[in-house]
Every structure is written in structure tokens, then in C-alpha cells.
Amino acid sequence: MNQFYTAESVTEGHPDKLCDLIADSVLDECLSHDALSRVACEVMATRGQIIVAGEITSLYEPSIPSIVRSVLRKVGYNPARFAIQCLIHKQSPDIAAGVDCSLEQRRNVDGSSPSLQLGAGDQGIMVGYACSETPQMLPLPVVLAHRLTSALTIALKSGAIQGLRPDGKAQVTVEYDEDGKPFRLDTVVLSAQHSPEIPADELCFELTDKVIAPALQVLPPDEDTKILINPAGRFVLGGPEADTGLTGRKLMVDSFR
């Protein structure tokens, strides 16, 4: 019996992904100046507002507003349209006591090995497993979805498609045969934020020609493949202006089960 598997990917301008990118950039900035930095940074983005909250323990004090503005500019949003609120404070001393040194050191057990000197928190992110379907060692639907959003971002930043805006999402459904091998593309959904001036039929043609076709060369659509471009209709309002974003809500985009 054949089975169908669907994977999703979003562009860096998607509000949830924007928040992840800001949090990652704060962490990168701290680590580049202090390799022992500990950063627990959450971000929320909504209409005209970016809120950065959390705990940072580091010898370096990052300029959160500068980092946020840099990310917004890189993604394609106008930083001047956002107020930035920073609610960053030091890590709780009780929590810090558990990670400043290891349990072995606190119990006077031999902790001379570097691997036994650093304490561990109680949080983790569970990710998927490697597989042999693609050179990337990821399932084919995941690879195709990421190829679509990557091509969409390139088309935006290069100006290959005039009128694109930063927000976007792709979903790809691949049909697998009875032996568990992917063999055909069942459905492609591509949502791309755009300016109101670009006609829908022109946008569909451009996206098909410059995004979908090159991104899906690995497994091209057949005559029965369903290709849905902006199936909800107009996608003029997007990003934080239309939908509140939050860190951690797109973990399944970066991993899989």
C-alpha cells in the first residue's frame, strides 16, 4: 500500500522563523565575544513590535536593538517600522548553581576531566534521524520543501521576481511505494507574500518558472501533481504585521520525525 509524507518549510521572513533568527543572532553575538556565554533568549514579533526576553550570562553585553535591526534589514523588513523592547536579565543564581559546575564537582567526585566540569541543564531538543533517501541524509519531502523556500528567498533578494515580500511557506507531499521508496510528487503548496501591484496570474507564472521548476528538478511534477500557489488568495499582508511570531514554533521545520 502506497503512503504519503508531507514536509513543511518557511522562509526567513516568516514571523516564527524571524524570531528564531533573532534569538540565534543574539546567541552568535555573545559566543563570538565570550565562548562560555549562556543564552536563554525568547523573541516575540507582532505588528510594529519586537520583544526580546530571557536570561543572558556572559562577559559580553550585546546590543539587542542593533542585532534585531540588523536581522530585520537582512530579511527584508524595514527596522524603522518596529519598536524593540528588551527584557533581558541575568540567569537565576539557583539555576546558575546547577550549571556553573558539574554534579561530580559539587559532590567532590573526580571532575578533573573537562567533560565533567560543566554542568548540564534539564532542557533539550529532540531531532530526527538520518536516512539514505537523499545526499543530505534527510527525507525527500524535507529536502524539496527547503529547496522551495530557499529558491523563494533567493528570488526575493536577487530581484528575480519583482513584487515579492519576505514571508513565505512551502509544503510538499511525496508518494512512497510499497517498498517505502519515494517515486512521485503528489502535492506542492507554495505561499509567497507579494505586493498588491503584481497580478495573480503573473505571480503564478513567475513562481512556477523561477522557483518551483528549478527547486523540484530532483523529483519533477507529473501530470497528476497538484500545484497550489497562494491557494488562500491574496497574500499581501504577511510577517509580523499579519501574524504574531514566537521562537521555537518552527522546530519541526529544522528537524523531522
What are these regions (language model features)?
Residues M1-A40, A45:
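N-terminal, positively charged regions that mediate nucleic acid binding
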Residues S58-L72:
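Active-site-surrounding "flap" and adjacent substrate/cofactor-binding loops of secreted or lumenal enzymes
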Residues E55-P62, R234-L251:
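Short glycine/threonine-rich loop-to-helix capping motif typified by GTGT followed
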Residues A40-S58:
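Short, charge-patterned binding micro-sites
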Residues T6, V10, G48, S66, ...:
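Glycine-rich, mobile lid/loop segments that gate access to catalytic sites or pores
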Residues S255-R257:
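Short, small-residue-rich loop/turn micro-motifs
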